[in-house]
């Protein structure tokens, strides 16, 4: 019997990206503590949390293939998470103005039946233009990116804040690296094509 595919995320962006592959899947809320561990690197945190989300969903889906993903944005070791409010988003964008940000996306595919997990990290470097307060305010009023690490949606109007982007998979920046995921699914005998 083929294994059910589960996306361990409540993110509408990840759900939309996964739906592009044309595979049937269900969504699970992973209920994971996303607090950083003292001394943990941002990259290690994203990898740990992507696997933790998949393993949390395995409690309800012990026979499934489960996808977990997590993303952190960093500049000089400082982590920029989801701002949550307009004021924090303004502060983040002021701090990121003119800087290159490392968006690191952790991806896990867990075979809950066997307990085996494959975990990968996909970096994307984004350079923000020098932003004026007026541009920041106009952007956030038109596209309140309060639930996005770094306060900008590259798949929307946020692209206007950026001067360059470097990475292997543009989907990684949105939160689900589809190139790596397709490879991982093939290894589990679930080909997309």
Curated annotation (Swiss-Prot):
It is an enzyme of class 3 (hydrolase). Its cofactor is a divalent metal cation. GO terms for molecular function: nucleoside triphosphate diphosphatase activity. Its main location: cytoplasm. The active site is at 70 (proton acceptor). It holds the Pfam family Maf. It catalyses: N(7)-methyl-GTP + H2O = N(7)-methyl-GMP + diphosphate + H(+). It is found in: Cytoplasm. One of its GO terms (biological process) is nucleotide metabolic process. Belongs to the Maf family. YceF subfamily. Nucleoside triphosphate pyrophosphatase that hydrolyzes 7-methyl-GTP (m(7)GTP). May have a dual role in cell division arrest and in preventing the incorporation of modified nucleotides into cellular nucleic acids. This is 7-methyl-GTP pyrophosphatase. The lineage of its organism: Bacteria, Pseudomonadati, Pseudomonadota, Betaproteobacteria, Rhodocyclales.
């Amino acid at each position: 019997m083929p294994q059910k595919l589960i996306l361990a995320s409540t993110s509408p962006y990840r759900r939309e990206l996964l739906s592009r592959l044309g595979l049937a899947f269900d969504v699970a809320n992973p209920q994971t503590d996303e607090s950083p561990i003292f001394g943990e690197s941002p990259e290690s945190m994203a990898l740990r949390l992507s696997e933790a989300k998949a393993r949390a969903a395995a409690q309800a889906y012990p026979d499934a293939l489960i996808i977990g993903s997590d993303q952190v944005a960093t500049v000089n070791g400082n982590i920029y998470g989801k701002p949550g409010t307009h004021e924090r988003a303004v502060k983040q964008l002021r701090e990121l103005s003119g800087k290159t940000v490392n968006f690191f996306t952790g991806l896990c595919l867990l075979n809950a039946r066997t307990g085996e997990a494959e975990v990968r990290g996909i970096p994307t470097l984004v350079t923000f233009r020098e932003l004026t307060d007026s541009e920041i305010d106009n952007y956030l009023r038109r596209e309140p990116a309060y639930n996005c690490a770094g306060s900008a949606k590259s798949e929307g109007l946020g692209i206007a804040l950026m001067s360059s982007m470097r990475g292997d998979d543009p989907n990684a920046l949105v939160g689900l690296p589809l190139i790596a995921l397709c490879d991982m699914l093939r290894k589990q005998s679930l080909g997309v094509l």
